[in-house]
Structure formats: structure tokens, C-alpha cells
């Protein structure tokens, strides 16, 4: 049957099944299940029917469970489904849930051919068995479907069209106007680092300093300090730049929070309870979160610190529940405080929030210099972080692992949305109700209100997005209808906020010229990976972001227009690079890149163009290499012989860890948050995440390129990574720009990987060390099977024992 590209939005309604014969599960499997239920005391012999929606084999929707309606289950549920899939059928599967999985009742098929032109299909469809024969009793399912092609969407390729843009639709939080946003590159930027970057209106870009601002915000709070983190470490200090000291700046984070709590400020912390500490990953050098130490530190103090496991929503099976609580994390990184009014004159207070990728823990403090060896006796002497080598320590010396990250401060109405997110999470998992009652403080803390006038050219519109479910957030609606109205997705008995993925999809679809991504991971859209040695349906990394990116590039090639996507990822995901988990993730990353390059090459060939696909999609990593200087820290011990550690120390090089979770579109729109480009972060029912999407309505790419704060921020990042500014960087979509960036990054990679080192690396942006064949296969760069100083394959390796759910 012919496959069609369904790129757009599918509206689907699942009504009911007319009649199911006999009900229940008969035969051999039913007997086994009855024994299991009897033995472990879960479940009873009632039917628990639900339906799923698939585009071929990619699951895109599921209804709630209807209990004890064996003959005529009625769901009446509607779905708004983003799709970017090749499919011949929309498949509806009816299943009976049970404690260890589910039993297939049958499947109904609606050909995509009938939908692709946009016609509405509303009908009863026959339910068939595995052999495509009608099931006993000739049952039918009533469904309604309508497909909306992306190219007919008024926002497709249009960017943000000024005041008419209302934000990402179908989301829990709506767009807020009159906000202020501060963007942070790294935890700290030293004075004089950023050169003059011109902005609109004769202004120049001014960098902000994340940990200084967090320190000030906590220090100046009077009523509340709310913190969530994947990890929070009490022993770090936030102020470390000797040229920018602050009163009390040498105090540790733990002491600062205890001090504020003793002054009567309500200090509440939700820190992920690393319950198994994910045993399979632990030995690969991952996950040292200090959760127990942090909880013990605050015991018997005025600080309320709750270790918060990633509990499943109640709807999953017994097996799924085990998966969620042992495999997934709370990943949001937020600080919410009350702050003084912008003028500083009034006694009134307002809410200020921080959202992004930087946890308040060890290993995170860094500057755009990202030194490997030169801060080991100063800023990093008591904060030496190097989890990629077994047995690494400050006594054995560098290289430490430098940390590149991005964060934001939000002021105005959106700051309250971050506060409400914290309150929802605290009420669900925080235990005691000790939240500040803001109604009682309404004469002190102003209600959500703009902090910028509508005609101020520096105003921002901001929208908050999440990946979270009812297991982690209190007060989600109970029914699918209410959930849909609140911009939530209903699952198989859980309610999910998946708006971060929606925000990325919408931003990519709107994009006109270029996209710049920095992310700790880059894998997904597994429904379209090549299936030579895997069963695609077992992977389930189904989020759409990589596919949306390649389809955007393809659409531009078809129209004869320039478009470039730049992606910066770490050399490898943090951990011992030879380990099974790191190698598995690199393998998924390779498959993702390959899928995208094949799309691009196919589109170029259709236009009879033989061109380097890296002119359209190009991947980078960050690294540093430093010559030895006199007066440097001298370690008292030495790493093991023939280890990655000693080789990296002698070669004086290491990757800069890209922990960022950011996307910039056309210099007019930015997403910053905690969510990685992988299934864990984008799913909604796996890791909990938070992100913001923002733009300045006076700085849009309508008649000329945008030259507001987002443009300045990107140029500052490119200066950090490339060690230079260039006029070609002003228009990243142009062939001159992408070729220059690729050329410079290629040169820097050669210097990084070379035997000898005469000078410091002039910049940090390195070509990601892969090649792309004429067919789109991702190959080794000649002579680069392994990352320098390691025995770790650049292209990764499939793991035979780690389940994909853990590494995707």
C-alpha cells in the first residue's frame, strides 16, 4: 500500500466500539494472567479496555482505560496530534490492560490516502485480528479523522507575525506579555569578555551573570525562596570572580539558605530522589547527585528540603510503574524568589524566577574561557568535576571537565507561572503544606502584572512549557475532555503536559531562515531510522524534533531557498566514553543524524543538485586545548598509566561539556530550559522538565533581520565558541556563513586532534568528527574511529543489554 508523508496536524476522535464478543481474555493467556494476579495480588479479572492511535507503528495517541465495560466501551476522546510520518494507515488498536502488559483485542485501519487531501472521515471501521480477518462478532470502532497539511498552516515559514502571534496553541500556560528576560551564557561571564555587538537602536549587547544574579536574588529575598533541581549541592559557592567580589560572597549555598530560613524566609526545596541511582548507569560514571547529603545537611534546620522520587502517575501497569520510578528523573532547574520592585523605591515585592539548564551544584561554575588546567588552584580547586575518567581527582590533576550551559531570569507575569509550577509539584510530592499563602501577602507581593510598558522596545512576550504528568503535578484535570481544554494530553490513565515538544515543533515550523541549537543530546524520530539491525518499534524515541528539522530543510530546498540548521552537542554524553550507556546513546545519535542527512540528499537529488548536505545541516562539539604555563597547579599524584585520563592530561585537551538546552530561530525566538532533545525530556511522562519560549515583539524578522537581545545573545555565544566575530555571522542562513563556520570548526578540530600543540586552541567550536557519504550514511572521519585519548567509538555501538527506554 502506498505511503504518504503526513506532515501537519491530525485531529482524531475515538468514540466507541459497538460490540465486543464475550469480553475478557480467554484461553491459555487468560489462565496465566489469572495465576499472576492471584500470586502477586494485583488486578482482578475485570476488563480494562483502551484504544491507541498509531501512524503505521509509531504510537501517537491513547485513550483512558474503561473498566468493566466488556461489550461496548465508550471513550469519546479527541486528540490533537502533530505528525511528520510516512504512513499508509492510521491504525486504531483496542487492548485489554493487565498488570504485566496488555492483551490485543484487534486493530482497525483507515487508509491515509483518504485523509491526505484534508477530507474529514467519520465512520465505523471494522476491527481485525493479526491476520487481518474480522474478529469474532464483527466488531467495529467509531472514529473521526481530519488531517491538516503543515503547508496550509498560516504560520508555516512565516516567523512571528507581530502582535497577532498568540503563542503556541493547546498548551497549559498561555503567552504572557510585558515581561523582561535576562539570558545567561555559562554560570559567569568575566568583565570585558564580550566585544561590542551592535543591536537595533544604536545599543550594544550587555552580558548578564547568572550565579551573581541568583546569589543576589536569594540574598535579597524576604518571604520565599523555592528551588527545584536534579541536583543541589550545599558546599558550592556562587561568587568566585576575584575582580567582582560581593559582601558575603564566600558563603556556601547551604549556609546561605539556612541563614535566609533563620531570618523567617520560607525556603522550600524539591530535589530529585535518586532512588536506585539507576544502578545500570551508576557504574558508567553517571549520576552523582548528592541527594542524600543535601537532605541530611538540612535536617533539623528551618529549610524544608524534600527528596522527590519520580513517581509514576497511577495509570501505568505494574511494570511501567517500576520503570518510571527507577529510570526517570526530576530534571527541572528553577529558583523562585520575591524581589524588590524594579524602581527599588516601593516597599512592595514581586516574583522573580530563574529557568534553564544550570543546576546549583558542583561542576557547574564556569566562564566562557572554559579552562582545563588554569583554574585548578582557584575557582575549581574545591570544585573539581571530571566524571569521564574512573578515579579522577584534584590530587591527580586536570583536565577537569569544563561546563557550557544556558539559563534565564524571568520577570513579569511569566515568573508567576514558574511559581505555580512549583506549587503544583510541592502539593503533589512536598509533604507538609508549608507553601507561602500569597493571598495573605497581597498587600506586600503585587499580583502578576507587566514589568514593561507595551511601547517599550525592550519588552518581551514569554510562554512557559513543561514535560510533566499528574504523578508530579497536583491538580491536573481528571477527565480527558477537561485535560484537552487545559492544553494537556491524556494517556492510558495519566494526564500529561508535553508542551516543550509542542513548542519546539511550532518554532521549527514557523522558521524562515535558520535554526541554531545547543543541546546535551540529539536523538529522536526513531520511527524513521533505518531499520537494518533494529526493530524501530522497540526504540520508542518518537518525538518529532529531528524529523521536523529535516523536513523544514527539505521544504526549503524544494522552494529554492536557503536554510541552515546548526547543532552543537557534546563530544559524548557525560560518563566513561567507552561504557555501554554512552556508546548506546552515540549510536542513537548517529541514526538520528543519518535519517536527517538522507532526507536532505534525497531532496537535493530531486533538484539535480550534488551538494554537501553540511551546507544545510551541520553538527559541532566544543573542546579546549591549553599549552602548559609556568605557575600552574601541580598535582601531587599521577593518573594510571595507559588510561584516558593520563592521555588527556599529556595531550592537554578535553571536551567542553555542552549541557545546554536551547534553540534560537531566526534571531527572533528563543527556547531555554531543562529539556534535552531526547525522548526522556520530550515525552512528558518520563523526566519532568520546564522551559520558556520568548521573543521581543519590536525585534522580529519581518522586513529586516532581527537585531534585539536574542541576536546579541547568539553573537556572544558564537564569539565564545569561535573566538571571533565576522560580518558573515549576521545572516547564518547564507552559504558564506555556514561554509565559513564549517571551515573554522574543521581547522579547530585538526588542531585539537593533532599530535603537537604549540599554542592554545584559538576557539572552542569543533567539527563533530563524522563524515557524510554521498548516500547520507554517517561515517567515520578518516583516522577518527575513536575520540582522541580514548578507545571510545565516535559512532557508538548498540547495547545488547541496556533497554532503549534507559538510553533514549
From Swiss-Prot:
Record carries keyword Hydrolase: yes
Cofactor entry: Ca(2+)
Annotated GO biological process: phosphatidylcholine catabolic process
Residues that hold Ca(2+) according to the record: 186, 370, 404, 720
Cofactor annotation comment: Ca(2+) requirement for activity depends on pH. Active either under acidic conditions with micromolar levels of calcium (PIP2-dependent) or at neutral pH with millimolar levels of calcium (PIP2-independent).
Residues reported to bind a 1,2-diacyl-sn-glycero-3-phosphate: 331, 520, 659
Gene Ontology CC: plasma membrane
EC numbers: 3.1.4.4
Catalytic residues identified in the record: 331, 333, 338, 659, 661, 666
Domain C2: 1-125
Any one GO MF annotation of this record: phospholipase D activity
Domain PLD phosphodiesterase: 326-364, 654-681
Catalytic activity: a 1,2-diacyl-sn-glycero-3-phosphocholine + H2O = a 1,2-diacyl-sn-glycero-3-phosphate + choline + H(+)
Record's keyword terms, sorted: Calcium, Hydrolase, Lipid degradation, Lipid metabolism, Metal-binding, Repeat
Stored InterPro entries: C2_dom (IPR000008), C2_domain_sf (IPR035892), PLipase_D/transphosphatidylase (IPR001736), PLipase_D_C (IPR024632), PLipase_D_fam (IPR015679), PLipase_D_pln (IPR011402)
Origin: domain of life: Eukaryota
UniProt-listed SMART domains: C2 (SM00239), PLDc (SM00155)
Disulfide bonds: none
Family indicated by similarity: Belongs to the phospholipase D family. C2-PLD subfamily.
Domain free text: C2 domain is a calcium-binding fold, and the binding promotes the protein association with membranes. A lower affinity toward calcium can be anticipated for PLD alpha due to the absence of two potential calcium ligands.
Function (record text): Hydrolyzes glycerol-phospholipids at the terminal phosphodiesteric bond. Plays an important role in various cellular processes.
The protein, known as: Phospholipase D alpha 1
Organism: Carica papaya (Papaya)
Amino acid at each position: 500500500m502506498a505511503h504518504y508523508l503526513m506532515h501537519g496536524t491530525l485531529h482524531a476522535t475515538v468514540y466507541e466500539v459497538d460490540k465486543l464478543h464475550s469480553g475478557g481474555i480467554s484461553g491459555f493467556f487468560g489462565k496465566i494472567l489469572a495465576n499472576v494476579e492471584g500470586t502477586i495480588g494485583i488486578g482482578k479479572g475485570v476488563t480494562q479496555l483502551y484504544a491507541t492511535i498509531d501512524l503505521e507503528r509509531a504510537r501517537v495517541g491513547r485513550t483512558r482505560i474503561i473498566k468493566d465495560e466488556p461489550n461496548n466501551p465508550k471513550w469519546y476522546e479527541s486528540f490533537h496530534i502533530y505528525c511528520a510520518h510516512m504512513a499508509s494507515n492510521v491504525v486504531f488498536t483496542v487492548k485489554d490492560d493487565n498488570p504485566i502488559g496488555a492483551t490485543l483485542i484487534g486493530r482497525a485501519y483507515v487508509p491515509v490516502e483518504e485523509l491526505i487531501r484534508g477530507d474529514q472521515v467519520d465512520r465505523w471501521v471494522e476491527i481485525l485480528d493479526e491476520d487481518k480477518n474480522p474478529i469474532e462478532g464483527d466488531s467495529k470502532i467509531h472514529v473521526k479523522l481530519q488531517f491538516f497539511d503543515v503547508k496550509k498552516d498560516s504560520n508555516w515559514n512565516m516567523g512571528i507575525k507581530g502582535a497577532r502571534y498568540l503563542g503556541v496553541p493547546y498548551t497549559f500556560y498561555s503567552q504572557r506579555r510585558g515581561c523582561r528576560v535576562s539570558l545567561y551564557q555559562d554560570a559567569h561571564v568575566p568583565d570585558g569578555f564580550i566585544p561590542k555587538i551592535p543591536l537595533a537602536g544604536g545599543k550594544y549587547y550587555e552580558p548578564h551573570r547568572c550565579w551573581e544574579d541568583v546569589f543576589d536574588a536569594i540574598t535579597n529575598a524576604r518571604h520565599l525562596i523555592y528551588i527545584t533541581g536534579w541536583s543541589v549541592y550545599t558546599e558550592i559557592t556562587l561568587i568566585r570572580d576575584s575582580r567582582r567580589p560581593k559582601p558575603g560572597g564566600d558563603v556556601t549555598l547551604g549556609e546561605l539558605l539556612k541563614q535566609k530560613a533563620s531570618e523567617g524566609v520560607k525556603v522550600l526545596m524539591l530535589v530529585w530522589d535518586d532512588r536506585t541511582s539507576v544502578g545500570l548507569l551508576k557504574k558508567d560514571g553517571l549520576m552523582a547527585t548528592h541527594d542524600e547529603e543535601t537532605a541530611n545537611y538540612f535536617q533539623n534546620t528551618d529549610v524544608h528540603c524534600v527528596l522527590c522520587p519520580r513517581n509514576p502517575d497511577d495509570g501505568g501497569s505494574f511494570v511501567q510503574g517500576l520503570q518510571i520510578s527507577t529510570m526517570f528523573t526530576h530534571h527541572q532547574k528553577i529558583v523562585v524568589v520575591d524581589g524588590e520592585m524594579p524602581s527599588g523605591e516601593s516597599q512592595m515585592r514581586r516574583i522573580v524566577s530563574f529557568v534553564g539548564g544550570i543546576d546549583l551544584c558542583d561542576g557547574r561554575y564556569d566562564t566562557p574561557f572554559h579552562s582545563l588546567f588554569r583554574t585548578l588552584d582557584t575557582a575549581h580547586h574545591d570544585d573539581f568535576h571530571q566524571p569521564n575518567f574512573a578515579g579522577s581527582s584534584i590530587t591527580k590533576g586536570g583536565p577537569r571537565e569544563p561546563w557550557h550551559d544556558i539559563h534565564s531570569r524571568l520577570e513579569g507575569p511569566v515568573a508567576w507561572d514558574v511559581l505555580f509550577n512549583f506549587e503544583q509539584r510541592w502539593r503533589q510530592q512536598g509533604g507538609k503544606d508549608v507553601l507561602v499563602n500569597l493571598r495573605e501577602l497581597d498587600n506586600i507581593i503585587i499580583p502578576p502584572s507587566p514589568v514593561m510598558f507595551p511601547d517599550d522596545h525592550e519588552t518581551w512576550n514569554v510562554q512557559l512549557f513543561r514535560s510533566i504528568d499528574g504523578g508530579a503535578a497536583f491538580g491536573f484535570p481528571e477527565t480527558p475532555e477537561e485535560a484537552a481544554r487545559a492544553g494537556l494530553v491524556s494517556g492510558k490513565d495519566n494526564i500529561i503536559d508535553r508542551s516543550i515538544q509542542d513548542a519546539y515543533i511550532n518554532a521549527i515550523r514557523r522558521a524562515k531562515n535558520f535554526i541554531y541549537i545547543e543541546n546535551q543530546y540529539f536523538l529522536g524520530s526513531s520511527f524513521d531510522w533505518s531499520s537494518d539491525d533494529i526493530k524501530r518499534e522497540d526504540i520508542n524515541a518518537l518525538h518529532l524534533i529531528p524529523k521536523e528539522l529535516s523536513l523544514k530543510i527539505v521544504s526549503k530546498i524544494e522552494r529554492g531557498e536557503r536554510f541552515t540548521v546548526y547543532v552543537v552537542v557534546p563530544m559524548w554524553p557525560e560518563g566513561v566514553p567507552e561504557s555501554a550507556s554512552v556508546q548506546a546513546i552515540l549510536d542513537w545519535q548517529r541514526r538520528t543524524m543519518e535519517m536527517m542527512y538522507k532526507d536532505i540528499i534525497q531532496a537535493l537529488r530531486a533538484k539535480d543538485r550534488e551538494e554537501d548536505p553540511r551546507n544545510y545541516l551541520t553538527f559541532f562539539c566544543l573542546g579546549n586545548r591549553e599549552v602548559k604555563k609556568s605557575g600552574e597547579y601541580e598535582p601531587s599524584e599521577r593518573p594510571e598509566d595507559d588510561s584516558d585520563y593520563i592521555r588527556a592530561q599529556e595531550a592537554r585537551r578535553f571536551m567542553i561539556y555542552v549541557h545546554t538546552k536551547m534553540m534560537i530561530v531566526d534571531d527572533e525566538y528563543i527556547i531555554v530550559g531543562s529539556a534535552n532533545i531526547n525522548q526522556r525530556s520530550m515525552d512528558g511522562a518520563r523526566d519532568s522538565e520546564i522551559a520558556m519560549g520568548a521573543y521581543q515583539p519590536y525585534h522580529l524578522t519581518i522586513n529586516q533581520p532581527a537585531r534585539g537581545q536574542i541576536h546579541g545573545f547568539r553573537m556572544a555565544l558564537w564569539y565564545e565558541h569561535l573566538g571571533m566575530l565576522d560580518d558573515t555571522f549576521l545572516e547564518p542562513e547564507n552559504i558564506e556563513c555556514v561554509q565559513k563556520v564549517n571551515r573554522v570548526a574543521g581547522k579547530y578540530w585538526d588542531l585539537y586532534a593533532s599530535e603537537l600543540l604549540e599554542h592554545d586552541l584559538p576557539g572552542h567550536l569543533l567539527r563533530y568528527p563524522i563524515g557524510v557519504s554521498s548516500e547520507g550514511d554517517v561515517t567515520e572521519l578518516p583516522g577518527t574511529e575513536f575520540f582522541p585519548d580514548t578507545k571510545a567509538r565516535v559512532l557508538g555501538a548498540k547495547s545488547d543489554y541496556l533497554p532503549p527506554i534507559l538510553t533514549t
